[in-house]
Amino acid sequence: FVFLHLNRRNMIAVLGTVVVIVTAIWFASPSLRERTATIFTQYHAYETSNEVTSAGMRLEFWRKSLHFFRDAPLIGHGTGSVRELFVEAAAGQTGVSAEVIANPHNQTLYVAVQWGAVGVIILYAMWLCHLLLFRGATLAHWVGLLVVVQNMTTSIFNSHLFDFHEGWMYVLGVGVAGGIVLAKEASMSSITRQSGNPA
């Protein structure tokens, strides 16, 4: 919204307001500061002692997933291969390195491990096409844009396209909003053609 509809001065004002609000929330919320401190503590425990922590597990999943991707960068290891790869990597390990999962909690890595760079290109092309579809200013455009941006953002820490509820929310959100947008564009195009070719 900021980049599409505001001039430079208003854009700076909006971004400045966001910075002030985020700063105020940071200082007003002890739980936010505590959660952030916990993440850093868990990261330190993972780095120094291979301790099983929430943040440490995610980092370990991502590290191993990048290693799996490097082993098969072009077309990946195949559909459903993630758990088997983690089982093999956990053999003889202790602590967080012994954890086995079927989902690395990152959409890009989940796709990269199974389908390689080809899959990642398709994933990002899909997101880009959907972002471009919702460039207008109607409610349908904004709903569609919100669904896509939310999915892209949360996919940093999860594989929401492949989670049942979140995946269907994306399909329905983009499908319904996209259908409305495309129908409106087709209607406008038809009106333009008719006005250009009077009977």
Question: Which residues does each predicted region cover?
Answer:
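Hydrophobic alpha-helical interface/terminus motif in multipass membrane transporters
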Residues: 82, 86, 130-134, 153
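Hydrophobic transmembrane alpha-helices and their immediate junctions
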Residues: 114-149
